[in-house]
Amino acid sequence: MDWSTLGVVIVPPIAGGIIGYFTNDLAISMLFKPYRAIKIGDRRLPFTPGLIPRNQERLAQKVSDAIMTSLLTPEELQAIAQRLLQTERVQGAIFWLLQLALDQVKSDTGQRTAQILANILRDFADQSLPRIIVALARREDFLQDQLDQVFDQVLLDLQLTDDQAQQLANWIINVVVPPDTLRLLLIDFLTDRNIAILDRDLRTKTSGTYWLVANVMGVQSSLVKLRTFCIEEKLACNAIVAELLTSLGIRQRFVEWLASLSLQNLPVRTVRQLRQQFRESVRGYTQNKGISVLQNLGTSVDWDETAMLIVKRLQTSEVVTTSLKDISEDLALILERYLERDLEMIVVKALPILNLDQVIIDRVNHTAPEDLEAAIQGIVKTELQAIVILGGVLGIVIGLLQSLILLFS
């Protein structure tokens, strides 16, 4: 076999294999190169820049449409959101946020948290709370159970101590009804008409010794003399009245009566009426003066100091730290129930906000043609290497066929 025949047999398979193996790289390079338009004067050379750089905007739109219609559909995004928002993941995220907030509160040295809390408490006490209380006071059952409990457990058991009863009895004897007041009351009572009525009743309605005294001696003159004595002899009359109060033990009787005074001794019907009146009084007072009273009470409280105490308590409270897990679990369950109902609607509303198609278009448009070519070449070399090898094999096969044709021709 001479060299010409050997060349006919060997060269076509080798050339076909080389061409087939490097065709993919050559084709990809032809799609991208040249990267920029080549101009001679003011005229652009044909086929410059390459096919993809020249139509990069349209390619970006096609890529975006393909991804949004085939890959990132609303159903797929909803499935992704469901996987991301599983209860365990949501609970972990909420727990992390709560722990982060607690750490921030513990490390807060600028009193910022306390100031924010103080403003919230001040606004709530001055504005929101009074309006809420007054609105609730318009209801018939406003604090009914609570007020009944206060009445039954506090007011119903309220009773004066011995010292309080002694002080109140002294006040009654010395201030309310002193001897001079009793003297004046006696003078006002012993009018001529009352004296005549007493004299007539004693004469007609008594018997025995009292009848004899009333009819023989009479009481009219004695009562008139008593009235005259009270009017003319003030000091002596007051002394006699004071002596009578002492000898009769009126002060001690007042003490015993006041010490035994209690709402429990009243009839059940009266107690029920007092309970109802107590509720209505509190309700009416709240409706009329509740806003002003609560606002004045709110202004009298040092909310800055109160907020600081609360924050310090939170910083050292073990209950807050141990309850974060339970709180995060409850919040995660609430969020899960909400997402089960409204996740599809949320995804539909979120898609226009995310504007994923425009993000893809912008990303493709802002990617340099060199980077696109390198990315595609990398995919071909790593993921599509079998196609490259297949191209070389096909080139060798075609070269062998060509060699056979040349030999037999």
From Swiss-Prot:
It is a multi-pass membrane protein. This is UPF0754 membrane protein AM1_5604. GO terms for cellular component: plasma membrane. The keyword Transmembrane applies. It is found in: Cell inner membrane. Signal peptide: none annotated. Belongs to the UPF0754 family. InterPro entries: DUF445, UCP032178. Keywords: Cell inner membrane, Cell membrane, Membrane, Transmembrane, Transmembrane helix. The chain crosses the membrane at residues 3-23, 387-407.
